[in-house]
UniProtKB/Swiss-Prot annotation:
Its cofactor is heme. Belongs to the cytochrome P450 family. Coiled coil: none annotated. Heme binds at C450. GO terms for cellular component: membrane. The lineage of its organism: Eukaryota, Viridiplantae, Streptophyta, Embryophyta, Tracheophyta. Its main location: membrane. GO terms for biological process: lipid metabolic process. This is Cytochrome P450 714C1. Its EC number is 1.14.-.-. Residues 1-6 are lumenal.
Length: 503
């Protein structure tokens, strides 16, 4: 009897501790953060237990779902209407909740600038992202913080310096020629002009570049990896509404969680096979994968080394091709609807590194596309220690959110025509295009600026220059302008274009 009583006491204590822990992570910690910020005058909508403001956000989205005017480049009111409503109500700095997370949204220029001066050990990637996006990015450069982030960046960043990009230009050209020839054959079959849905072609092209340049293989060889990562992207994007409860949600045996686990394991095995094969050959074109494999041996166990390899390869595979592909897609959409800009862009038939630097108009088109349609809509960081942004003391554990779209469409920074496609605004560089350079952040801001931006820009220049020398583009009658958020901003119903072969 005494043993049974003792067991009951132990179970009650353990249950109490578990309940206290859950209460702390789901409510008390958020309450403490909220109180500290509200004492400093930061306001926001009142949250509810467990759900925060997520129910209200869903309601606002539903009510304003069809408020966007067709054809406009400002789609914030469609995808993120709660951002606009909260900013109008509470100002450029406000607080909202997704349950266990307190999110401080910052679009005030001075505070955005301040964010860039903090190190990744102080203001880093949120822990919830590391958990909720683990299947997509693993423990790679995208999600790591502190010393581990610095170590990974030291290994990977040199592979994307301009001297390395020079050796990738021909790879990009070869991948682009494959698309050119496919489109020419399709058009020749019908004579002169036909509708082509360009999305998959541009995604495959970008995937081919990453596969060749970073992993020494063709897209065909890595096709299964890219397809499964795309499937993961779609499933994970559907779970975003549960982000505040992600720490618990991911443990439930739901259909989507089971699909994520299955795809994650399949991608892991495929990446390890590719890495093992390419490391064996030690090919000069796949120095990145070799650098990752060598870096994984730094005092790690076999399992930790595999996690290191898989996480960073996932980051390169997905991050390296998806953002570039969707930017190329939006570039063609904007050029198709602005024929005068398309004509100005037509240029050389031979490209090298020096020629790329002289493609000023094409560069301006890419910069303007990245302003209007940045692949990632927000920058998310977590205060890993107490930090100060402007006059605001931001307590540890706060998620700091910078809405790229709102910065890029701010009329005070960009002028009254901020919603319009005007590549010439970048004629004299970013500094002259807007009031403050830190209001333009397509590749991030501060020490975590994207390491792959040189490759992305080189690829986009080659692809656009090549396509525009061969084809003219115009909108298809079937095109429906409906940007969608699926971890990246992409056309909701694809991009069908009328493609005409030039003489």
């Amino acid at each position: 009897m005494e043993k049974l009583l003792a067991l009951i006491v132990v179970l009650v204590i353990l249950l109490s501790l578990a309940l206290f822990y859950l209460c702390n992570i789901l409510w008390l910690r958020a309450v403490k953060i909220r109180k500290k910020l509200r004492r400093q005058g930061i306001r926001g909508p009142k949250p509810t237990f467990l759900y925060g403001n997520t129910k209200e956000i869903k309601r606002i989205r539903q009510e304003l779902k069809f408020s966007q005017k067709q054809g406009t480049n400002n789609f914030i009111s469609t995808l993120f209407p709660h951002f606009l409503l909260c900013r109008e109500t509470y100002g450029p700095v406000f607080l909202y909740s997704t349950g266990a997370l307190e999110i401080l949204q910052v679009s005030h220029p001075d505070m955005v600038k301040d964010i860039g001066r903090w190190t990744p050990s102080e203001l880093g990637k949120p822990n919830y992202l590391k958990k909720s996006r683990k299947a997509l990015f693993g423990g790679g450069l995208f999600t790591e913080n502190g010393d581990e982030w610095a170590y990974q960046r030291k290994i990977i960043a040199p592979e994307f310096f301009m001297d390395k990009i020079k050796g990738m230009i021909q790879l990009i050209e070869d991948a682009t020629v494959t698309v050119l020839e496919a489109w020419e054959d399709m058009i020749d079959d019908v004579g002169g002009c036909r509708e082509i849905v360009v999305d998959d072609y541009l995604r495959n092209l970008s995937a081919d570049v990453i596969a060749r340049a970073c992993f020494g293989s063709s897209f065909t060889k890595g096709e299964e990896i890219f397809c499964k990562l795309r499937q993961l992207q779609k499933v994970i994007a559907q779970q975003d509404s549960f982000v505040g409860l992600s720490a618990l949600w991911k443990y439930l045996p739901t259909k989507s969680n089971q699909e994520i686990q299955m795809l994650d394991e399949q991608v892991r095995l495929l990446i390890l096979d590719v890495a093992k094969e390419q490391h064996h050959y030690q090919d000069s074109h796949n120095s990145l994968v070799n650098a990752i494999i060598d870096g994984a041996q730094d005092g790690r166990s076999a399992a930790e080394a595999e996690d290191f390899i898989v996480g960073n390869c996932k980051t390169i595979y997905f991050g390296g091709h998806e953002s570039t592909a969707v930017t190329a897609i939006w570039c063609l959409m904007l050029l198709a609807t602005h024929s005068e800009a398309m004509e100005v862009c037509r240029g050389r038939s031979t490209l090298d590194v020096d020629a790329l630097r002289r493609l000023k108009i094409v560069t301006m088109v890419i910069q303007e596309t990245l302003r209007l349609y940045p692949p990632a809509s927000v920058m998310m960081q977590e205060a890993l220690t107490d930090v100060k942004l402007g006059n605001i003391e931001v307590p540890r554990g706060t998620i700091v959110q910078v809405p790229r779209l709102m910065l890029h469409l701010d009329k005070e920074a960009w002028g009254a025509d901020a919603d319009e496609f005007r590549p010439d605004r970048f004629a004299n560089g970013v500094a002259a295009a807007c009031r403050a350079a830190h209001m333009y952040v397509p590749f991030g801001h501060g020490p975590r600026t994207c390491i792959g931006q040189n490759l992305a820009m080189a690829e986009l220049k080659v692809v656009l220059a090549r396509l525009l020398t061969k084809f003219a583009f115009s909108p298809s009658p079937r095109y429906r302008h409906s940007p969608a958020f699926r971890l990246t901003i992409e056309p909701g119903f694809g991009l069908p274009l009328m493609v005409t072969k030039l003489p």
